[in-house]
């Protein structure tokens, strides 16, 4: 079957953005060429989107620039906006608190147009080239992401990347989820299969401690109803120390009974409660973000799993979301 590709809008600079609608089984998803955004996810019989999006490109260029996007080349924080890569020091954009690089700032893949490489009724592959030196990062990098749906209601995302010089890569989808379609996610049940997490500083960078969740508010190893600030979430959960085969790491269940199981190959999962992720006309805590990735600020913590990618090597991430309803 042919792909369903439609005009979505134009950027502030006049570039056209397209929307690709994927369908299979009970699931429908919409992916944008802007930022490789996962704009809409719908489960048959549920009268609202499970992820939070917008119908306006201008929102994704502004306050919603992280909503649903694929963030890279390095997601999350880099303390001091600097890193040593293959013995050379590089400096990046100071995009947060004047001393931290957050989501690669104005050069991230979430604020770029991607090219459609292939598409059919249930899948799309997008690609983008990142030139050497852009944002301070070394290497000419070729990045591709494939989204596809498998019946009955599974959405998968595969990210690959190569470079012609030693560099660092760490991508994550940054979708916000609310399985009830309500103004606040309060009352969802959450389980994260992690024994440890990374405590954060006042500017939300890792302290360097790898802390046990046991005995803390961050212990989500068993399903638990969460509420706003219980716990306050903007931390990375440590799922392991290396990329592994796809395995289930998270279960989120709304009061509606709609359930999402997330699986990933990645060793970390940044959980964020959406306190500052406010869509136009909406309020804080509308959705929960779960970002499968390597641990944040890894370049400044040699004890963390490495995000180095050498010339000739290939970056490869696989993440899956599976949905059910009562």
Predicted regions and their residues:
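An exposed, glycine/acidic-rich loop-and-rim segment of catalytic or binding clefts
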Residues: 1-326
